[in-house]
């Protein structure tokens, strides 16, 4: 693991939300998993993307036209799009690999939209839509875009997307379109990676994701419980018990306390039976 990347990520995590540069933070997440990743190089590549786009537009172009122009640039001219063949490859969450391969998942592709939009002056923010990250263009009039396809979505389109992920009885709610903070975007990016690594039983990588989530939201009991579970899976039972005990001391969440108490009980050393 890249300790320099972790140290810089910790610095960014301590900043006010509006001061966080999402592209840099996302690249640092990737850098911790990949040796010798040159973060400034990829930030420069994003700047070059902006320069290429800027040469295609008129500064006086109405915002609506600029939005369509940017979508065409990202998804047609540059060829960015969703990795439909290997959706759950962790590489899809690493911004440097998305820049290199021009393939990713909704949230990593959203970072391309957000990065370019912020440079151009078009308000672009992430939308923590259930199961499928979206982006919103514009301040007063929201234009909802699926970063996986580059398609502008109507509210009925969003309702269909929701039902595809949550079932036919899912109801579209306005709260699903609330802008995501920068930290919320990073949390979701890390959560996606964590789920992939957890399913692969890649505990070192899972722990790295949890550690960074705790940098973004310190003392969050849910993540501390997950940390205890990682120690348990790694066979470090003393550290697992210690971590679970910390949650019992600090959390008022009865459900979480009950869950942790059961784990602690299961981890108690068994008395030897005399024969």
Located regions from the model:
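A structural boundary/capping signal
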Residues: 1-275
């Amino acid at each position: 693991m890249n300790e320099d990347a972790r140290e810089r990520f910790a610095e960014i995590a301590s900043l006010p939300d509006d001061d966080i540069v999402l592209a840099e933070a996302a690249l640092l997440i990737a850098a911790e998993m990949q040796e010798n990743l040159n973060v400034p190089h990829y930030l420069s590549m994003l700047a070059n993307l902006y320069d290429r786009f800027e040469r295609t537009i008129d500064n006086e172009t109405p915002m609506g036209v600029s939005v369509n122009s940017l979508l065409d640039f990202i998804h047609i001219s540059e060829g960015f799009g969703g990795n439909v063949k290997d959706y759950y490859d962790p590489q899809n969450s690493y911004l440097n690999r998305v820049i290199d391969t021009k393939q990713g998942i909704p949230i990593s592709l959203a970072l391309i939209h957000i990065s370019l939009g912020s440079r151009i002056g078009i308000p672009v923010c992430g939308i923590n839509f259930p199961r499928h990250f979206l982006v919103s263009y514009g301040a007063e009039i929201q234009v909802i875009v699926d970063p996986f396809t580059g398609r502008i979505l109507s509210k009925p389109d969003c309702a269909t997307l929701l039902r595809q992920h949550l079932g036919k009885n899912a109801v579209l709610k306005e709260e699903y379109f609330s802008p995501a903070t920068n930290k919320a975007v990073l949390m979701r990016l890390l959560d996606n990676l964590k789920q992939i690594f957890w399913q692969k039983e890649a505990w070192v990588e899972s722990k790295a994701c949890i550690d960074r989530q705790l940098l973004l939201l310190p003392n969050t009991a849910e993540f501390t419980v997950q940390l205890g579970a990682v120690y348990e899976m790694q066979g470090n039972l003393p550290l697992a018990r210690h971590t679970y005990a910390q949650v019992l001391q600090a959390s008022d969440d009865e459900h979480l306390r009950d869950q942790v108490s059961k784990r602690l009980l299961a981890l108690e050393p068994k008395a030897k039976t005399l024969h």
